[in-house]
């Protein structure tokens, strides 16, 4: 079992990653993975894309066929086009409904596994110290603030540790992003200089 310190830290890492990547990006990726599974929804999605290609192809053929000169051929294409389009719209409507249900389930699972878990930990472990502070190292008021609201005095509370983890992860991510931008800038600056030396 992970200690409370690491559990809270990993919950905040997960929250940060979800917020950084974006919920809609995660939803789209999970929907694409779900469509790879052998389910009826995946079968409907494949059928939908096949019908879409067929509708586009028939529409192209109708546009290339003169409705006055080749009316019989054009009318036959039109009937096939209308039938395929109706099938496509029916499957598309069912697929849209299934995607909405899937998105709802993913949003609930995502909330429960990140923010919901964070709130649960705050209430369940509100009187539990995350770790104890060395005796006499901090003034009484600082010990009280670090144990706020319900942890024993002389320890760090779950609420304070939550704030520390969230802030530390955000700061470390900013530092990492700045270092990455700087390294890319240096690499880009070296590339033109190296090309200039080769041409000389």
UniProtKB/Swiss-Prot annotation:
Q: Which GO terms describe its molecular function?
A: protein-membrane adaptor activity
| GO CC annotation, single | GET complex
**Stored InterPro entries:** Get1, Get1_fungi, Helix_hairpin_bin_sf
> What's any GO biological process attached to this entry?
tail-anchored membrane protein insertion into ER membrane
Instruction: State the source organism's domain of life.
Output: Eukaryota
Subcellular localization: Endoplasmic reticulum membrane
- Where are the bilayer-spanning segments? 5-24, 111-131, 156-172
Segments on the Cytoplasmic side according to the record's topology features: 25-110, 173-200
Signal sequence residues:
none
Q: Which UniProt keywords apply?
A: Coiled coil, Endoplasmic reticulum, Membrane, Transmembrane, Transmembrane helix, Transport
> Topological domains (Lumenal): residue ranges?
1-4, 132-155
- From the record, what ranges are coiled-coil? 42-99
| The UniProt record lists the keyword Cell wall biogenesis/degradation | no
One family from Pfam that matches here is CHD5
The protein's topology relative to the membrane is: Multi-pass membrane protein
Asked if the Swiss-Prot or TrEMBL record annotates the protein with the keyword Endoplasmic reticulum, the reply is yes
Complexes and interactors: Interacts with get3.
> What does this protein do, in the record's words?
Required for the post-translational delivery of tail-anchored (TA) proteins to the endoplasmic reticulum. Acts as a membrane receptor for soluble get3, which recognizes and selectively binds the transmembrane domain of TA proteins in the cytosol.
| Family recorded in the similarity comment | Belongs to the WRB/GET1 family.
Q: What is this protein called?
A: Protein get1
Q: Which organism is it from?
A: Aspergillus clavatus (strain ATCC 1007 / CBS 513.65 / DSM 816 / NCTC 3887 / NRRL 1 / QM 1276 / 107)
The gene from which this protein is expressed is get1
